[in-house]
Amino acid sequence: MNPGPSAAIDDELWALVLGLQRHAAVAGAAPTEPVAYRLEPRWGLSPLQPDEHRGAVLIQDPDGRWRCGPALAKGRRAAARPLLRLYLPLFSTTLAPGWTVAHLGQSLDGCIATHSGDSCFVTGVENIRHLHRMRALADAVIVGAGTVVSDDPRLTTRLVPGPSPVRVIIDPMRRLADHYRVFQDGAAETLLCCSHEHAGARVRHGQAEVVPVATKAGSLDLIGLKSELRGRGLRRLFVEGGGVTVSRFVAAGAVDRLQVTVAPVLIGQGRPGIVLPRVSSLSEALRAPAQVVAMGEDTCYELDLGTARSRPDANSGSKSESKSGSI
């Protein structure tokens, strides 16, 4: 598959996001008053004087959050504003210690692949390009062993400008052979995370480093895994799949933002996306602030799970007045 040019965000605006990434890496605390910035072709973000705010592409508020400036309100740039809202929160000072974003692409009936595991590709070119951008913004991209077997992914940023992240493969029992591309191509640093029991004496798996992680209830302790990665300076984590891995991260409360991109296709009895423990009533369901972004023919739903966990009424929602469904 060869994704074509993106209609939603062009090279100039992606350069803006990468400029913000460089700026955030060296910036200090949030400003005491709003600060507006323009994009300099050679130098990245440059602050503006208060009387120049009309030309601002980005504004940082005293709460540390970023928003689109007036210069992105009209013309072709305006079409990119919804998509930029997926990226701007990642540079907020409230997420400065690090963030974990999980993503799944699925069919309208909730499947990420056919029953045989064919998943290339459920979503369209816009979402594939978005995945590569998210990799470029992350320190590490995380996938489970099932994704490696089904897709043999490279997990690089070959479709967009930007650095490829460290590749983290979760394989608790170390069952994967070492012939997959992530273990052999040398395109990026790669970590194979498994249990202490299965780490063995070998410290390498192909070209990947073997990293033993504590287990919990038969699976890797994901909070412990995140701690191990933080100790290596990997604080911005992108969990790219598959359904089992993303579901476990969500169930463990280890995800700040969850992105689910839905394609207008019906797969039938395929492999499910998010699978969480059962709840008895809708009042127990996880409800979170959300935004919706169009990606070509697909629709991306992003849930702010970090905010949902911090709200005492996060799981409360409207209930029907009767069992008949009347409201």
Where are these regions (language model features)?
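Enzymes that bind and transform nitrogen-containing heteroaromatic metabolites
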Residues: M1-I327
